[in-house]
Each structure stands twice: as C-alpha cells, then as structure tokens.
Amino acid sequence: MIPSREEWIAALVERHGEERQNAFLNATVAICGLGGLGSNIATALTRAGVGKLILIDFDKVDITNLNRQQYKMSQLGRPKTECCLENIREISPYTEAIIHTVKLTEENIPEMLGEADIICEAFDKADQKAMLVNTVLETFPDKYVLSGTGMAGFGSANTIQSRKVFGKLYLCGDEKSDVNDGIGLVASRVMVCAAHEAHMVLRLLSGETEV
C-alpha cells in the first residue's frame, strides 16, 4: 500500500524537522540535463521531499548511460525526461514535476527556468555548461546556480568538493578531471558529485549559504 501524502510528509518531518522540511516542500528546483549528474540529483531531491522539480533534457536513454545514470534497461530508447519522471514517481508520487524535452538555449532559458528558486547545471559539455551558467547569471541575478565540473575517472572521491565561487554561483567537482582525457565516467564518482550538488541545494533551501 502506498502511504498517503500526509504520512509521507510526516516521515520526512521526523527526519529533517518541520521548519526545514517546509522549506523543501515550498521550493522549486530546475535540473538542466538528466544524465549522470541530473538523474542522480533528481533522485536525491525527491527523497528529501523537495516540492517541485523542473526536469529538462532533449536526449534519450542509451545503453552507454546505464553505468552511471538512474535509468533501467527497460527504459532504453525513451526520452530521459519521461523516464526520470517515471522513476521519481515510484519514489514519491507527491513530488510535483514539470518536464521539458528540449535543448536549452540562450533564447529559451528565461521561459524554462523563470519559476525555479535554484538551478542545477548538469550538462556534459563545457561550452553548454558555460552558456547555461552565464545566461542564468545575466537573466536571473537573484537565483542560485550550481554547476558540476570535474567528476571523471577513478581518482579519489575525496577530491570532489563544493565551492562558492561568488555571489550565488557554486561549483561542485574536482574542477580538473575531464572525460575527454580518456579516463571515462563511473557511477560511484559521478554520484559523489551529484550528491554535492543536491546537498548544496538542500543547504541553500535551509538558509545556509556557506559550503
């Protein structure tokens, strides 16, 4: 039997406290890119009881994604937005979610992300990461932005950290490793970086702005 919404919230309040949980429930977080970073961030924020997620990706689930992304073989070939929504619904049917199966650009970012309190950048390519961060900082100077950079390879997970760059911009990762160096990506290290982003979101929603 699936618990009621009231039972679900009561269980979260027991773990997080009422004031903090209310902050989570009243928040809207956008996750831009639903690959290794984004799909894991979405899972973590759903489990924490964040009230509303905006899930954005244009891609479909591929077999090469399964080593680090929160998808299943039964979902191969389907849009990541639909599959991510399906997966978080299994965790909590009470999490509100909007999906956009589109590629984010400088032109559509204002429309797609205007409702979000916090924006998580979770793209693969450096130029797309920079485009999103720069556009958001220019368009929405009052919004928090978290970006993932440096999570490739089998190096120590302890080198992955969160850093406040300036204002409302935060970076999560080792800021060095790059998949283009031929060192690959593995779930355990990517998930550490995703956890840093998700945890910083929860800290910000709790009013804690320092890393």
Task: Please report, for each region that a protein language model flagged, where it lies by residue.
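N-terminal charged helix/coil linker that caps or initiates catalytic domains
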Residues: 1-29
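Glycine-rich phosphate/adenylate-binding loop
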Residues: 2-3, 112-118, 122-211
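Glycine-rich phosphate-binding loop and adjoining beta1-alpha1-beta2 segment
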Residues: 57-91
